[in-house]
């Protein structure tokens, strides 16, 4: 493992990005036709009568009338009382910067669908947007901004038109153009969401948190960054190192406390533990379980080698942490475990609930994982290992443990953990999880009211 800036968490944020149908007219700078150009150049030098123009160009009367009608239609000329034809103010404007050749604006119309996020009014490319806000933290947009979004879009489109051309948001073959006017703005259905992943890093030399990176896909982001900071402060957290010490003792993990002992990650100690697990054919990691590619490669290898006649339990017990599951990558890993169930195991994702009857929390989880089959979504009573420890296990094969450390040194949770295939250790970890799920919810109640901490399917 190289000693560079270390990513310890990755979180998706979303901002409402309404869709609008925008129709606009634009002007293209274009040299005028030969006759037009020389006739305009002549009139710039001196006013003329029709007969003089006919003589100068060798036109007959009809050709002269057609040429003059064209200029008159565009309001580039007018007749004086003495019969002389002169350039109008509009005609004089065609000669930009005292150039000899005139340039005229050709008006064209264009329409398209555009998306604009509502915090810094950045227009967005389609692939930076998402129809869903699941697996992310939504940043707050003021109601006033939502109600005035059409007018904000109009002003921003006008003011940043050239920049939108350069950023390839507005796609036109012609490049040297300018906006003439916006003809129509029409909101289009349910808004999209601007989705971006914010990486949270620490410095390996000191363990200190690094400042957040800018969002790479947008130019304007002052309000976005302020909204992220406000949201993180709103979530807040108390230091849970004391509770983690108890969880580590339950797991029989003597190593991780040394890594976090001072309230920050000791990278040198982390490397020692990493190498120790590597020597034991295990894996030690920093970050969310669902971000560990090597971990899931090992898991997939184990699953692919299972006997299809076996009927093992593959359980994933989520922690009680606001940042858990707030990144789209979790969806792919869960779906992968669902798809491989034909290999001979029963997969369940256990999600923490304050009580069995809490319909609001159940519905929130169902919405959060709305693209996942509800046949694998289970509820359990929050509080397993103080809610700070996540477990993923397959009976008789492996166990993954991830502690979710809330430390004052870091703005968000620092997940850290390990995978083991040591059967003795695996069985110990699995017994902790199974004993908790089967333990009575109300041990002092009558037998009919005792209940279990395993609440069963979220949607029976």
Model regions and ranges:
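Minor-groove-contacting beta-hairpin "wing" of winged helix-turn-helix DNA-binding domains
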Residues: 83-89
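Basic, amphipathic N-terminal segments
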Residues: 1-6
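Short, amphipathic alpha-helical interaction segments positioned at domain boundaries
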Residues: 89-141
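PLD/PLD-like phosphodiesterase catalytic module centered on the HKD motif
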Residues: 20-24, 79, 140-312, 324-460
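Short acidic, hydrophobic short linear motifs in intrinsically disordered regions
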Residues: 45-56
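Short alpha-helical segments that sit at the start of domains
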Residues: 8-39, 51, 63
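Short amphipathic alpha-helical interaction segments
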Residues: 57-73
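A short, conserved structural fragment
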Residues: 72-82
């Amino acid at each position: 493992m190289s000693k560079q800036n270390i990513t310890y968490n990755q979180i998706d944020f979303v901002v409402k990005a309404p869709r609008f149908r925008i129709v606009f007219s634009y002007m293209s700078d274009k040299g005028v036709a030969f006759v037009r150009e020389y006739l305009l150049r002549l009139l710039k030098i001196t006013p003329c009568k029709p007969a003089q123009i006919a003589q100068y160009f060798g036109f007959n009367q009809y050709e002269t009338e057609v040429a003059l009608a064209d200029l008159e239609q565009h309001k580039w000329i007018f007749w004086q009382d003495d019969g002389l034809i002169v350039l109008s103010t509009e005609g004089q404007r065609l000669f930009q910067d005292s150039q000899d050749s005139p340039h005229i604006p050709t008006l064209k119309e264009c329409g398209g669908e555009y998306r604009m996020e509502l915090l810094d009014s950045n227009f967005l490319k389609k692939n930076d947007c998402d129809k869903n806000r699941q697996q992310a933290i939504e940043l707050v947009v003021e109601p006033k901004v939502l109600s005035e979004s059409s007018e904000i879009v109009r002003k921003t489109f006008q003011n940043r038109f050239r920049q939108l051309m350069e950023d390839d948001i507005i796609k036109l073959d012609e490049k040297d153009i300018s906006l003439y006017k916006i003809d129509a703005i029409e909101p289009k259905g349910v808004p999209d969401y601007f989705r971006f992943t914010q990486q949270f890093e620490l410095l390996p030399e000191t363990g200190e948190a690094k400042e957040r990176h800018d969002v790479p896909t947008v130019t304007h982001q002052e309000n976005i960054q302020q909204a992220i900071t406000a949201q993180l402060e709103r979530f807040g957290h108390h230091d849970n190192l004391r509770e983690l010490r108890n969880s580590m003792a339950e797991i029989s993990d003597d190593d991780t406390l040394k890594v976090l002992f001072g309230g920050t990650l000791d990278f040198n100690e982390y490397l020692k533990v990493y190498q120790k697990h590597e020597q034991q054919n295990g894996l030690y990691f920093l970050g969310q379980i669902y971000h560990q590619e090597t971990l899931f490669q090992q898991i997939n290898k184990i699953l692919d080698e299972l006997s299809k006649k076996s009927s093992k339990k593959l359980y994933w017990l989520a922690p009680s942490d606001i940042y858990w599951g707030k990144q789209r990558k979790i969806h792919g890993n869960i779906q992968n475990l669902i798809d491989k169930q034909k290999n001979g195991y029963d997969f369940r994702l256990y999600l923490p609930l304050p009580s069995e009857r809490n319909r609001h929390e159940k519905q929130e989880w169902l919405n959060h994982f709305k693209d996942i089959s509800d046949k694998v979504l289970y509820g359990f009573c929050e509080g397993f290992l103080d809610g700070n420890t996540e477990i993923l296990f397959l009976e008789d094969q492996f166990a993954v443990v991830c502690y979710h450390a809330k430390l004052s040194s870091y703005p968000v949770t620092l997940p850290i953990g390990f995978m083991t295939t040591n059967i003795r250790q695996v069985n110990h970890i699995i017994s902790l999880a199974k004993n908790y799920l089967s333990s009575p919810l109300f041990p002092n109640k009558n037998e009919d009211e005792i209940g279990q901490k395993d609440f069963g399917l979220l949607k029976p």
